[in-house]
């Protein structure tokens, strides 16, 4: 029984990222090639003219406190809960606004943090 291309594609599609990375390294070693595309080939392969570049969806976000608003104490409490900082450190972050509260947060984490901070009266920006 021979294996079809569809079966190979299905098998590779079910691999985890780590398994796929190891698989690619093994193929590179076995065939003496590199999976990285040369820069010149990438420039030639780029679509020309009116084709708009596809934007990748951002997966990591920075949570930035723009201002504490009127309820500074409530905002400090939320900052402490979100960041795990002590009272003094959280107060310094709030007093030093605009300041980055968290970097490389997931989309869900960033949205939840923004919701909590806005409810406490803060002005927040997600980048």
UniProtKB/Swiss-Prot annotation:
Disulfide bonds: none annotated. Keywords: Ribonucleoprotein, Ribosomal protein. GO terms for cellular component: cytosolic large ribosomal subunit. The keyword Ribosomal protein applies. Forms part of the ribosomal stalk which helps the ribosome interact with GTP-bound translation factors. Is thus essential for accurate translation. Belongs to the bacterial ribosomal protein bL12 family. This is Large ribosomal subunit protein bL12. It comes from Nitratidesulfovibrio vulgaris (strain ATCC 29579 / DSM 644 / CCUG 34227 / NCIMB 8303 / VKM B-1760 / Hildenborough).
């Amino acid at each position: 029984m021979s294996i079809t291309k569809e079966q190979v594609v299905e098998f590779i599609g079910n691999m985890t990222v780590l398994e796929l990375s190891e698989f690619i390294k093994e193929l590179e070693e076995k065939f003496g090639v590199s999976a990285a595309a040369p820069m010149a080939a990438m420039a030639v392969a780029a679509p020309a003219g009116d084709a708009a570049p596809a934007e990748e969806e951002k997966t990591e976000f920075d949570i930035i406190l723009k201002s504490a608003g009127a309820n500074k104490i409530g905002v400090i409490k939320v900052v402490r809960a979100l960041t795990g900082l002590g009272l003094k450190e959280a107060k310094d972050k709030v007093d030093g606004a605009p300041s980055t509260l968290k970097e490389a947060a997931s989309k869900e984490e960033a949205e939840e943090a923004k919701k909590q901070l806005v409810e406490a009266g803060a002005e927040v920006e997600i980048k």
